[in-house]
């Protein structure tokens, strides 16, 4: 039993370090492309995505992180109300989040509503960029910076240089 626990801890540490690099690259792209954007919002199931949120917060040093906890799709309306009132500079999707992660219907809802109020969304997956995130870099992108020019136009922001358009 002890070996299984050690193996699980090792796997968590390895996957956490992989995520750290992914969020580092994403935050770096955000800071480089939009240097005036310092307030980052994250909408996720806080309990289920706690590790990823901590890693993201570490990567986003010097930026203010606003965490909006959602337990299910029924909470997305309240989350949108908070986002509309607080109007963050950018929203980052948490890959793998069971409620609002890349590829989910809640993420699509969030991306569309954020574009309406000119707030760009960033992701770590190709799925997130295809859904309408302006920028994405992470494991599913092979480390390549992916951009969505249409989403950038709708959100009123510049397209990151050197990205591959989707």
Q: Where are the model-predicted features located?
A:
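Sec-dependent N-terminal signal peptides
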Residues: 4-14
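Short hydrophobic alpha-helices and adjacent helix-cap/hinge residues
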Residues: 16-166
């Amino acid at each position: 039993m002890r070996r299984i626990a050690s193996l699980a801890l090792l796997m968590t540490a390895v996957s956490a370090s992989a995520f750290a690099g992914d969020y580092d690259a994403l935050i770096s792209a955000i800071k480089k492309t939009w240097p005036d954007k310092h307030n980052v919002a994250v909408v996720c199931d806080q309990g289920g995505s706690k590790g990823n949120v901590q890693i993201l917060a570490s990567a986003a040093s010097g930026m203010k992180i606003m965490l909006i906890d959602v337990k299910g799709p029924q909470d997305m309306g309240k989350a949108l109300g908070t986002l509309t009132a607080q109007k963050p500079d950018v929203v980052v999707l948490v890959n793998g989040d069971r409620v609002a992660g890349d590829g989910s219907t809640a993420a699509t809802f969030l991306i569309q509503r954020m574009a309406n109020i000119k707030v760009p969304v960033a992701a770590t997956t190709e799925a997130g960029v295809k859904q309408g995130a302006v920028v994405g870099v992470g494991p599913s992108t092979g480390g390549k910076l992916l951009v969505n020019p249409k989403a950038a136009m709708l959100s009123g922001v510049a397209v990151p240089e050197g990205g591959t358009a989707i």
